[in-house]
UniProtKB/Swiss-Prot annotation:
Cofactor note: Binds 1 NADP(+) per subunit.
Reaction catalysis annotation: ADP-D-glycero-beta-D-manno-heptose = ADP-L-glycero-beta-D-manno-heptose
E.C. code: 5.1.3.20
Required co-factors: NADP(+)
Protein name listed in UniProt: ADP-L-glycero-D-manno-heptose-6-epimerase
GO biological process, one term: ADP-L-glycero-beta-D-manno-heptose biosynthetic process
Protein family: Belongs to the NAD(P)-dependent epimerase/dehydratase family. HldD subfamily.
Annotated source species: Burkholderia ambifaria (strain ATCC BAA-244 / DSM 16087 / CCUG 44356 / LMG 19182 / AMMD) (Burkholderia cepacia (strain AMMD))
Binding site for NADP(+): 11-12, 32-33, 39, 54, 75-79, 92, 143, 169, 177
């Protein structure tokens, strides 16, 4: 049966397509918007049956043009948290997602979709409960509102609906994201260009570079998606993070040491990297004061209760792999 991936040329979508290919799935319809044409590179080493622009997909899917569809991985969205055009964001992320959901429910197709940890906003608890959800931007609100629709639909749904609140995802195939690419990606490019990585200094009680995030490898994101693909009886909204909060220092230090290893140089401690000027701290920008999350950490209780028991890569493991992959691309 056919599998559809929206946002297929994007970061997470392309990694899901590749992961499907690696297990023998190639009857894949890729859906995206290639106005930003450079995204096509993410699919060059992937096998797909067909490609559709997002503007024609929903109408054709709704009228059954693709025959029996097993599942839709709905990864397509505007993920720019700095986007201020609320009308565009709601149409692209909310209304479009509702249309894809409705078509999946009508045809009995599995619906696996990208939610976001941005739903939690400034919360200090990251559990899938309404009372801790307070998005700070229209991107987060578009995801939040769709999750509320899912909560209302789930009790009567006859086919799988699984949403994943992605935390800070990094890994291959994100180059096209520009400023919205991961910290690991930017640290890699900065070190290659300048010979050092710059991090924010002390802020809000956190020592320089010690602001923390739940950084999750896109490898693990794809694995979780495929676990639910294999278990259509499991539905719900799930946090998708490692369950660990690691500081930005860990990302930067791993980037530096991996690049040193590729040059046959020995690893350095964080203190040595700072002392040698390989990591530098800059004053926290006034523009971000009061708008910056210093801590995120996924509560994995629901995900683990659903049966996903595989370990997640640490920053040191995942970023090392990613830097080696990036080094092979340049």
């Amino acid at each position: 049966m056919t599998v559809i991936v929206t946002g297929a040329a994007g970061f997470i979508g392309a990694n899901i397509v590749k992961a499907l290919n690696e297990r023998g799935e190639s009857r894949i319809i890729a859906v995206d918007n290639l106005t930003r044409a450079d995204k096509f590179r993410n699919l060059v080493d992937c096998e797909i049956d067909d490609y559709l622009d997002k503007t024609e997909f929903v109408e054709r899917f709704t009228r059954g043009d693709f025959g029996k569809v097993r599942a839709v991985f709905h990864e397509g969205a505007c993920s720019d948290t700095m986007e201020t055009d609320g009308r565009y964001m709601m149409d692209n992320n909310f209304r479009y997602s509702r249309a894809v959901l409705d078509a999946c429910l009508a045809q009995g197709a599995q619906f696996l979709y990208a939610s976001s940890a941005a739903i939690y906003g400034g919360s200090t608890r990251f559990v899938e409960e309404r009372e801790v959800e307070a998005p700070l931007n229209v991107y987060g609100y578009s995801k939040f509102l769709f999750d509320q629709v899912i909560r209302r639909v789930l009790p009567s749904a006859k086919s799988q609906i699984a949403g994943f609140r992605y935390f800070n995802v990094y890994g291959p195939r994100e180059t096209h994201k520009g400023r919205m690419a991961s910290v690991a990606f930017h640290n890699f490019n900065q070190f290659r260009a300048e010979g050092k990585v710059k991090l924010f200094g002390e802020y809000n009680g956190y020592a320089p570079g010690e602001q923390t995030r739940d950084f999750v490898s896109v490898e693990d994101v794809a694995k979780v998606n495929l676990f639910f693909f294999d278990h259509p009886e499991k539905s719900g909204i799930f946090n998708l993070g490692t369950g660990r909060a690691q500081p930005f220092n860990d990302i930067a230090s791993t980037v530096v040491n991996t690049l040193r290893a590729l040059d046959n140089l020995p690893p350095l401690t964080l203190a040595q990297q700072v002392e040698q000027g390989l990591i530098e701290y800059v004053a926290f920008p006034d523009a971000l004061r009061g708008k910056y999350q210093c801590f995120t950490q996924a509560d994995q209780t629901k995900l683990r209760s659903a049966g996903y028991d595989a370990p997640f890569l640490t920053v040191q493991e995942g970023v090392d792999r990613y830097v080696r992959w990036l080094s092979g691309q340049v």
